């Protein structure tokens, strides 16, 4: 009986925090305004997509590679609340003809779930790459053995498309490592990845077991996870790590046990052997120097403070710049209002998105910034190609493009 009472109390506490989180805009939103910054000379286009594009990287000046990840659908079953997620995919966006194509995964095991998120490339030659993909592999047949997998594909560039051939997999138990958030390929054998350990539901069931009671929660941004994440953040229970993995030796090394709670996006500067790791809650970017002799080892050498929340970053070796998609809630707007209070025609806004460009050769100064009311909510990635800036979101369908007028 005491256990049941404890469960009920925990449930009410998490619901209370979730209610405050979801309604904080109502409490604070009337006091703050945000003007759209640096978009007067740009026009935007929203390209419809089948599913949300959770992550995006640049292959070259012609192609973007995107991971399509379906949001969980939440159902009630005879035993507990559970999720079911349809398979996602890898999409190729052709910048020249504005075509978005779902790429076939050659030789990929048909029975293996595919829920891709983070992406990273290693260049073999001008036409051939290894593509590494985070796969949140939810096993509906054996739900207590959910795995986080990193899939390795051989990517070959063709005239108007690419081919992806499945090679092999590195898997991690969710029970011990939590969720893999981002990856960066150092060479063809060494990868770095960030993880986040947090509360998660013990089981997943198929749609055949649905009761329809919680259908209104579909695509609710990991609704149950949000409840527990809020509680864990309040008591500093969430932990994040940075690891390296040697694909050939099968060895894992802990590089950083974060003092904060949000090790997220990774990007690698191969020329200078620098690894960038963003932490949205702490609002900074950690810079590690990768050992040239032992690339599975890294040393923290610098920290850059950021103004906004950043989920993922991309290092553009052609321009020696870092691109970041930014997002924010009502809590960020105090600083924004103070910064832009002299602007005219402020519009009320509850959330915002945007883009930041860091110029590495000028000591990581911000060389371009865009802020806008969310035409696309929950920005997870942003990349600049020539005069166009591309935005993706893991929560909302669509590819948003800002172009010079």
Kindly give the residue locations of the regions a language model identified.
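Short loop/turn segments that connect beta-strands within beta-propeller blades
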Residues: 94-98, 155-162, 246-250, 289-294, ...
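Beta-rich, blade/repeat-based domains predominating
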Residues: 50-59, 86-87, 108-123, 171-190, ...
């Amino acid at each position: 009986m005491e256990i049941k009472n404890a469960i009920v109390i925990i449930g009410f506490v998490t619901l209370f925090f979730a209610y405050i989180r979801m309604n904080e805009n109502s409490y604070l939103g009337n006091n703050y305004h945000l003007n759209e910054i640096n978009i007067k000379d740009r026009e935007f286009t929203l390209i419809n997509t089948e599913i949300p594009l959770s992550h995006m990287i640049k292959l070259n000046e012609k192609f973007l590679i995107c991971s399509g990840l379906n949001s969980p659908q939440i159902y009630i079953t005879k035993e507990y609340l559970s999720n079911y997620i349809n398979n996602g995919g890898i999409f190729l966006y052709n910048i020249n003809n504005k075509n978005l194509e779902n790429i076939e995964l050659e030789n990929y095991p048909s029975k293996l779930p595919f829920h891709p998120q983070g992406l990273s490339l290693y260049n073999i030659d001008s036409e051939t790459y290894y593509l590494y993909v985070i796969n949140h592999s939810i096993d509906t047949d054996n739900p207590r053995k959910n795995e986080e997998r990193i899939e390795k594909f051989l990517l070959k560039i063709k005239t108007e498309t690419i081919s992806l051939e499945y090679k092999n997999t590195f898997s991690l138990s969710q029970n011990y490592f939590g969720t893999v958030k981002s990856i960066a390929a150092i060479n063809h054998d060494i990868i770095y990845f960030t993880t986040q350990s947090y509360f998660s539901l013990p089981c997943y069931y198929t749609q055949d077991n649905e009761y329809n009671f919680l259908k209104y929660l579909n695509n609710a941004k990991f609704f149950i996870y949000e409840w527990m994440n809020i509680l864990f953040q309040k008591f500093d229970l969430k932990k994040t790590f940075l690891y390296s993995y040697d694909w050939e030796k099968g060895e894992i090394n802990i590089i950083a046990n974060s003092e904060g709670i949000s090790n997220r996006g990774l990007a690698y500067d191969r020329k200078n052997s620098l690894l960038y790791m963003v932490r949205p809650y702490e609002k900074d970017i950690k810079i590690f120097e990768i050992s040239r002799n032992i690339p599975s080892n890294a040393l923290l050498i610098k920290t850059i403070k950021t103004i906004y929340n950043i989920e993922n970053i991309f290092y553009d070796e052609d321009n020696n710049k870092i691109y970041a998609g930014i997002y924010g809630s009502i809590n960020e707007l105090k600083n924004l209002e103070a910064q832009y209070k002299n602007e005219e025609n402020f519009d009320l806004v509850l959330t915002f998105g945007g883009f930041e460009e860091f110029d590495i050769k000028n000591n990581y100064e911000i060389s371009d910034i865009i802020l806008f009311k969310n035409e696309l909510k929950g920005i997870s990635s942003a990349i600049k190609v020539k005069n166009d800036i591309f935005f993706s979101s893991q929560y909302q369908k669509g590819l948003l493009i800002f172009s010079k007028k």
